[in-house]
A protein has these predicted regions:
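Mobile genetic element proteins and their domesticated derivatives, centered on retroelements
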Residues: 18-22, 29, 59, 76, ...
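Short, amphipathic alpha-helical "recognition" segments used to contact nucleic acids or chromatin
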Residues: 1-13, 60-67
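Residue-level signal for the short linker/turn that defines the boundary of a DNA-recognition helix
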Residues: 12-14, 71, 87, 252
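Mobile-element integrase/transposase regions
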Residues: 54, 86-150, 169-177, 181-191, ...
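K/E-rich alpha-helical interaction surfaces of small helical-bundle regulatory domains
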Residues: 17-37, 260-278
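C-terminal domain-tail junction helix/linker
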Residues: 57, 121, 214-218, 240-297
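Basic, flexible linker segments flanking DNA-binding modules
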Residues: 26-128, 227, 281-291
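RNase H-like two-metal-ion nuclease catalytic core shared by retroviral integrases
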Residues: 48, 198-200, 206-213, 220-242, ...
Length: 297
């Protein structure tokens, strides 16, 4: 109709006039006139070793194989590289989002006047550690306290302990484990040069705990009051511990819990990967720094 010539003007009817007279949107007309059977548009650039439909099973297999919950797309991308499957982070993020494989996220709060813009991590192992406690419930013995200590550089769990009583003396057990393992002996001034970050819990501020730190040569480094960010390394480990062990398993006795914690400590130290260390495990970070220190000596 738009190509038909008007008998009065001797000019063809244009598409705009025809659509206006018929009260028809031009977009609808153009959509109806589109070529049929055309292939859907493809993403530009090279496909890589795997197409999208082939890469998704690898993503699911990687998430199923890891012993941890809540790992994000960056760690999935790193584990794919270890398996010689090369792709981009943005592609992994897109596919995990499309297939609802991303870890759940919490919306952050707007920072107030107390903004923590410093850093509590270190560049060398055995410079600063963090300690904290959490609790869980056992079926036969009730509530149990869990104490642990973490290195602020490698994020390695250097000691962990479960007990029925959450006293100041029990809080020292992970520290004793770490000193024996990392410094070779439990003796006066054995951990000279190490600082320990802790909160203001009654166990950590007690006279006995502080005296034990002084005996070992460890400097006490308490976080600010009502500021858990100051002990953020230990708080992050609490979250990992809960999401991967305490919230997914039940325990009958405290001893069963203690054995499970020791097993988790080994799994975490040798399999949890850390982005800021190039997706290496805590044990790998410590080993590399120890070897570099031995060569320098």
């Amino acid at each position: 109709m738009s190509r038909t010539t008007s008998p009065s003007t001797r000019k063809p009817y244009c598409l705009v006039r025809v659509c206006r007279v018929w009260c028809l949107p031009r977009s609808t007309l153009y959509w109806q006139r589109r070529p049929k059977g055309r292939q859907p548009p493809k993403r530009p650039g090279p496909v890589g070793p795997c197409a999208d439909h082939d890469l998704v099973p690898h993503l699911k297999a990687t998430l199923a194989a890891t012993p941890f919950h809540g790992e994000g797309y960056r760690k999935v991308w790193a584990r794919l590289r270890y398996a010689d499957i090369r792709t981009s982070k943005r592609r992994v993020l897109r596919l995990m989002r499309e297939h609802q494989l991303l870890a759940p996220q919490r919306r952050g709060r707007r920072p107030g006047p107390r903004v923590h813009d410093g850093t509590i991590t270190t560049t060398r192992v055995n410079e600063m550690g963090g300690t904290d406690m959490t609790a869980t419930f056992t079926a036969a013995e009730g509530q149990a306290a869990i104490f642990f200590a973490v290195d602020h550089c490698s994020l390695e769990c250097v000691g962990i302990h479960a007990t029925k009583r959450g006293s100041r003396f029990e809080a020292l057990e992970p520290l004793r484990q770490g000193v024996r393992e990392r410094f070779g002996a439990f003796a006066p001034q054995a951990a000279q040069g190490l600082a320990l970050r802790h909160d203001h819990g009654s166990q950590y501020m007690s006279h006995d705990f502080q005296e034990e730190l002084a005996f070992l040569g460890i400097a006490s480094s308490p976080a600010f009051v009502r500021a858990p960010e100051g002990n953020g390394v230990a708080e992050r480990f609490v979250r990992i511990l809960k999401e991967n062990l305490l919230w997914v398993r039940t325990f009958n006795t405290v001893e069963e819990l203690r054995q499970a914690l020791l097993e988790f400590q080994h799994t975490y130290n040798y399999h949890w990967i850390i982005e800021r260390h190039g997706y290496k495990t805590p044990a790998q970070v410590r080993l590399e720094q120890s070897q570099a220190l031995a060569l320098a000596a």
